[in-house]
Amino acid sequence: MSRPARQLARVIGPAAVPGVAALFKILGDPSRLALLDLISHGERAVADLAAEAGLTESATSHQLRILRTARLVRVRRAGRQVFYALDDLHVARLLRDAAAHAGEK
């Protein structure tokens, strides 16, 4: 194991490293981050998310499915519309912390 990987294991525990790495891989996609940012302001319909993110509804649904599988967003259906919201406050904190870290010089 490389030195940075050993240091990470000390913070989150060796058993959690693969899951955390998978989460960061999911968050590494700009389209998914843009969708999470839009959803962080409140529950949103797929069509609205697609329009604001500049994606097709099909591409948006695909990315949202990945985020839902990772338990980052939750879904609510109302008739023919599908709405997404952040799964919990941990997701909002994760996004806020990542943005703060990325903005550090």
Each predicted region: which residue ranges?
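N-terminal leader segment of winged-helix/HTH proteins
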Residues: 1-27
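Conserved segment of winged-helix/HTH DNA-binding domains
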Residues: 16-20, 24, 85-105
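Short capping segments at the starts of secondary-structure elements
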Residues: 30, 41-45
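Residues within the alpha-helical elements of helix-turn-helix
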Residues: 38, 52
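Helix-turn-helix DNA-binding motif, specifically the short coil turn and the N-cap/start of the second
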Residues: 45, 56-59, 87
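Alpha-helical residues within the helix-turn-helix
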Residues: 51, 62, 68-69
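Beta-hairpin "wing" of winged helix-turn-helix
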Residues: 68-78, 85
